[in-house]
Swiss-Prot record:
Annotated source species: Paracidovorax citrulli (strain AAC00-1)
Site (Important for activity): residue numbering on this chain: 103
Function: Catalyzes the NADPH-dependent reduction of glutamyl-tRNA(Glu) to glutamate 1-semialdehyde (GSA).
Keyword annotations from UniProtKB, A to Z: NADP, Oxidoreductase, Porphyrin biosynthesis
MF annotations from Gene Ontology: glutamyl-tRNA reductase activity; NADP binding
Catalytic activities: (S)-4-amino-5-oxopentanoate + tRNA(Glu) + NADP(+) = L-glutamyl-tRNA(Glu) + NADPH + H(+)
Stored Pfam families: GlutR_dimer, GlutR_N, Shikimate_DH
GO biological process, one term: protoporphyrinogen IX biosynthetic process from glutamate
Official protein name in the record: Glutamyl-tRNA reductase
Assembly mode: Homodimer.
Keyword Secreted appears in the UniProt entry: no
Pathway stated in the Swiss-Prot or TrEMBL entry: Porphyrin-containing compound metabolism; protoporphyrin-IX biosynthesis; 5-aminolevulinate from L-glutamyl-tRNA(Glu): step 1/2
C-alpha cells in the first residue's frame, strides 16, 4: 500500500490562490467521491482511500492506494480550482510514504500552522476525518495515519510547552484593533458569520467590553445563539449594506464562495461615517471582503496573511519545545512506517498471517464437516472428537514435518532450529 499527499498552505500560496481550493465541510463528501472515481480510473484500483483537509490556511489531500498517483491527484485538484497544473505545482508540495506521516503529525501538532502550537487545527483535522468516514472514503491505512496523528498531537501537547503563550488569529485581531482605537470599550463591532472562527474572535473582543456587539448571519437562529452569549444583537446578512456604517470594527468569516462585502458598500458606509476610520478583518478563505477595499482611505483591512507577523512574535521563545515535539514526531513516524512495512505484500508479515489464518480456517471447516457426518451416522461422541483433533493436528503438522526431512544436513539442522523455536517455545524458555 502506498500513501501520498499534496497541498497548498500559507507558506506556499497567496490568499487568492488558496481561496480557489477552499472546500466547505458540506462539500467534502461529494468532492471525495469525485476524487476517488478519478483516481480509481487512473490507478485501476477503485478502492483508493482519500481525505481532504481544508482550512483558511491550507488545503491538503491525503491518499492511500496500491500505487501512488501524485501527478493525477495534482491534475484533478488543479481542474477543481480552475487553474493550470503547472501553476498549482509551483505553489504546492507533494509527499510520499514517511514524509506524509511526518507532515500529518506536524500539522496535527500545530508545528506547521501560521500560529505555532495552535490547537484549532487538530479539531479541523478530526472534522476532515469524520467527513471522509461519512463519505466512505476512509480505509485502514488512512484511518491508521490519522489516529496516530491525533495520538502524536496529544503527546506533543501534554509533554511540551508548544502551545504556551500562543497568540491566536483572534487575539491578533484584538491587538491590531487596540493599535487603531485608543479605547476598545468605545467601539461598535460587527461579526459577520457564526462559525467557530467568529466565535473565537467574538470571545476575545467581548473580553474588552465594546460599546456594542452585533452578529450578522444568513440564518438568524445560529446568529441569535451566538449573540445572546455575548449580550449582542443579531441581524440578517441581507441588512448588512444598509447598516455597515454603524460599526467601527468588522470581523468577517463565512463559507461564502464570493465576497459578501463589496467596495461600493464600504464606500457608502465611509461617506455616512464622515470618513471616521473603520477596522476590518477578513478571516475567510476565499475572501469575504473585496480586496479593493484595502486601498480606501480610512479603511484598515487585514486578511489572515496580514496577521502572520503578529501571531509569530512569540514563536522564537518556543524553539526548545519545537525540538521536543519533533523528537516525538520522529518516533511516531518510525512506528507508523513499521506498521506499514508489516502490511506490505512484499516482506510484510500481515499478509502471511492472513494466509495462515485462511489455511487454518479451511482445515477447520473440513474437519468440522467430517465430524458432523460422523455424528449424523450415530458414531460415539468421544471417538468423533478424537478423530477431529487428530485430523486437525495432522493437517497442521504435515507440511512442517515434511520440511524437517527435506534438504541436506545443514538445511535440516536450520529447519529443526526454526521448528523448535516455533513449536516448542515453552520447553525452550524453561531450558528443557
Amino acid at each position: 500500500m502506498a500513501v501520498w499527499a499534496l497541498g497548498i498552505n500559507h507558506t506556499t500560496a497567496p490568499l487568492d490562490l488558496r481561496g480557489r481550493f477552499a472546500f466547505a465541510i458540506d462539500q467534502i463528501a461529494p468532492t471525495l467521491q469525485g476524487l476517488r472515481q478519478s483516481l480509481g480510473g487512473a490507478t485501476r484500483h477503485p478502492q483508493v482511500e482519500t481525505a481532504i483537509l481544508s482550512t483558511c490556511n491550507r488545503t491538503e489531500i491525503y491518499c492511500a492506494g496500491q500505487q501512488p498517483a501524485l501527478d493525477h491527484t495534482l491534475d484533478w485538484l488543479a481542474h477543481s480550482g480552475g487553474v493550470s497544473p503547472s501553476l498549482l505545482r509551483s505553489h504546492s508540495y507533494t509527499l510520499e510514504e514517511s514524509l506524509v506521516a511526518r507532515h500529518a503529525f506536524r500539522v496535527a501538532s500545530g508545528l506547521d500552522s501560521m500560529v505555532l502550537g495552535e490547537a484549532q487545527i487538530l479539531g479541523q483535522m478530526k472534522d476532515a476525518v469524520r467527513a471522509a468516514e461519512t463519505a466512505g472514503a476512509l480505509g485502514t491505512t488512512l484511518n491508521q495515519l490519522f489516529q496516530r496523528s491525533f495520538a502524536v498531537a496529544k503527546e506533543v501537547r501534554t509533554s511540551t510547552e508548544i502551545g504556551a503563550h500562543s497568540i491566536s488569529m483572534a487575539a491578533a485581531a484584538v491587538r491590531l484593533a487596540g493599535q487603531l482605537f485608543e479605547d476598545l470599550t468605545e467601539i461598535r463591532i460587527l461579526f459577520v458569520g457564526a462559525g467557530e472562527m467568529i466565535e473565537l474572535a467574538a470571545t476575545h473582543f467581548a473580553a474588552k467590553n465594546p460599546k456594542s456587539l452585533a452578529i450578522a448571519n444568513r440564518t438568524l437562529e445560529r446568529g441569535e445563539k451566538l449573540a445572546s452569549r455575548f449580550g449582542g444583537e443579531v441581524m440578517r446578512l441581507a441588512d448588512l449594506p444598509d447598516r455597515l456604517h454603524e460599526f467601527d470594527a468588522v470581523v468577517s468569516c463565512t463559507a461564502s464562495s464570493l465576497p459578501i462585502i463589496g467596495l461600493g458598500a464600504v464606500e457608502r458606509a465611509l461617506k455616512k461615517r464622515r470618513h471616521r476610520p473603520m477596522f476590518m478583518v477578513d478571516l475567510a478563505v476565499p475572501r469575504d471582503i473585496e480586496p479593493e477595499v484595502k486601498a480606501l482611505e480610512d479603511i484598515y483591512l487585514y486578511t489572515v496573511d496580514d496577521l502572520a507577523s503578529v501571531v509569530q512574535t512569540a514563536q522564537a521563545s518556543r524553539q526548545a519545545a519545537v525540538a521536543q515535539a519533533e523528537a516525538i514526531i520522529d518516533a511516531g513516524v518510525q512506528s507508523f512506517m513499521h506498521w506499514m512495512d508489516q502490511r506490505s505484500p512484499v516482506g510484510g508479515v500481515v499478509p502471511l498471517i492472513q494466509q495462515i489464518h485462511a489455511q487454518a480456517d479451511e482445515w477447520r471447516a473440513l474437519e468440522i464437516a467430517r465430524a458432523k457426518k460422523l455424528i449424523a451416522r450415530g458414531e460415539d461422541m468421544d471417538a468423533v472428537l478424537e478423530a477431529l483433533s487428530r485430523g486437525l493436528t495432522q493437517k497442521m503438522l504435515h507440511g512442517t514435518l515434511a520440511e524437517l526431512r527435506a534438504g541436506d544436513a545443514d538445511t535440516r539442522a536450520q529447519t529443526a532450529q526454526t521448528v523448535s523455536r516455533l513449536f516448542l517455545r515453552s520447553q525452550s524458555r524453561s531450558g528443557l
